[in-house]
């Protein structure tokens, strides 16, 4: 018999799943359609496609874990699912980092030679970082996969549960998040500095004039700031979710922490949609037509 609290958590998890599924699905369809329409790879569309695609998969992984964990707590494939989860989560972070670098490249205006050099090579550097990430994490995945088949045989007087050391290796995989998070913070900091210097120039030279560049700065910072907040919640909730799954597992705690984690891929998709005028207008039209159709067919 489910408790009222657990039933409420399940309802919240389903709502978050539907929001993330629709939001990220809309972004994937839009970015792919833009690529088909223009017949050329736009950096922005490619980043949004990768980011939304990773979030779409991440949303499914969270709901699968919540659905299957109570039934198959000791299943070996669930452990592989947790490793794949870490890889997709890190890929999502890398694409969010590329988005912050893209904003920084398009919006900021600095005259320092080092910045100009990085600005010219930002796209190629990003591709090399992504390639290096996949190679390193592929090697780590193979290593951890071998560990699953050959658990460590240490001193018989000191034995750790299989689940505990498995999650320890999942934490090792998660260490790949440090580099993209640092790059994200640096590029976001450069956006803040650029906004501050631009604001000072505008106060001196063009007071009262509509400032399009400042608006672009603020829109980008809102998106990146919300991402950082949601990602920090995701990171802080992850260890508690893992701890809740160790023996004896606490199902209510698992739902609490993974519901908090699910807010990251679902809510940020809405923030991205609000920052893309064409997608926002399309979603508003669809929502308005849905409401009108419901009124026409309603009682």
From Swiss-Prot:
It comes from the Eukaryota. GO terms for cellular component: membrane; plasma membrane. Residues 23-45, 104-127, 197-223, 275-299 are cytoplasmic. One of its GO terms (molecular function) is G protein-coupled receptor activity. InterPro entries: TAS2R. Glycans are attached at residue 155. Residues 1, 67-82, 149-175, 245-253 are extracellular. The keyword Secreted does not apply. Receptor that may play a role in the perception of bitterness and is gustducin-linked. May play a role in sensing the chemical composition of the gastrointestinal content. The activity of this receptor may stimulate alpha gustducin, mediate PLC-beta-2 activation and lead to the gating of TRPM5. This is Taste receptor type 2 member 5. The lineage of its organism: Eukaryota, Metazoa, Chordata, Craniata, Vertebrata.
């Amino acid at each position: 018999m489910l408790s009222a609290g657990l039933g409420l958590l399940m309802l919240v998890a389903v709502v978050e799943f539907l929001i993330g599924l629709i939001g990220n699905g809309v972004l994937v369809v839009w970015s792919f359609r833009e690529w088909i329409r223009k017949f050329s790879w736009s950096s922005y569309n490619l980043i949004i496609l990768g980011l939304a695609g990773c979030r779409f998969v991440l949303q499914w992984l969270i709901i699968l874990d919540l659905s299957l964990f109570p039934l198959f707590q000791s299943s070996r494939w669930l452990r592989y699912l947790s490793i794949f989860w870490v890889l997709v989560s890190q890929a999502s972070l890398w694409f969010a980092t590329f988005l912050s670098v893209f904003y920084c490249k398009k919006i900021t205006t600095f005259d320092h030679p080092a910045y100009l050099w990085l600005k010219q090579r930002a796209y190629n550097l990003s591709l090399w970082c992504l390639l290096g990430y996949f190679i390193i994490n592929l090697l780590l995945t193979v290593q951890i996969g071998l560990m699953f088949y050959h658990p460590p045989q240490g001193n018989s007087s000191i034995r750790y549960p299989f689940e505990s050391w498995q999650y320890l290796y999942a934490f090792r995989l998660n260490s790949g998040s440090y580099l993209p998070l640092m790059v994200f913070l640096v590029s976001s900091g450069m956006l803040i500095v650029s906004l501050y210097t631009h604001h000072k120039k505008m106060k001196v030279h063009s007071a009262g004039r509509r400032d399009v560049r400042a608006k672009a700065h603020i829109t980008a910072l809102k998106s990146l700031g919300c991402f950082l907040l949601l990602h920090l919640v995701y990171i802080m909730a992850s260890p508690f979710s893992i701890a809740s799954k160790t023996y004896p597992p606490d199902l209510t705690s698992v739902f609490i922490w993974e519901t908090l984690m699910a807010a990251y891929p679902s809510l940020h998709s809405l923030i991205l949609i609000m920052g893309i005028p064409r997608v926002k207008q399309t979603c508003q039209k669809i929502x308005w037509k849905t409401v009108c159709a419901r009124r026409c067919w309603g009682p």
